[in-house]
């Protein structure tokens, strides 16, 4: 099976986290963040 998960270097992940900190954690905020980042999964600490 083919994987569609995009791999990103840690530096890019850290930058994305900083860039998208303003998103809320509600359903709409997560939806907006996933659309804006082009990711199909968000990992939050």
Curated annotation (Swiss-Prot):
The keyword rRNA-binding does not apply. One of its GO terms (molecular function) is toxin activity. The keyword Cell membrane does not apply. Keywords: Enterotoxin, Toxin, Virulence. One of 3 components (of 35, 45 and 105 kDa) of the enterotoxin. One of 3 components required for cytotoxicity (tested in African green monkey Vero cells); the complex is not hemolytic. This strain was isolated from a food poisoning outbreak in Norway in 1995. This is Enterotoxin.
């Amino acid at each position: 099976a083919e994987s569609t998960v995009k791999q990103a270097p840690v530096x890019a992940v850290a930058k994305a986290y900083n860039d998208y900190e303003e998103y809320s954690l509600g359903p709409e905020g997560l939806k907006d963040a996933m659309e804006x980042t082009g990711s199909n999964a968000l990992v939050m600490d």
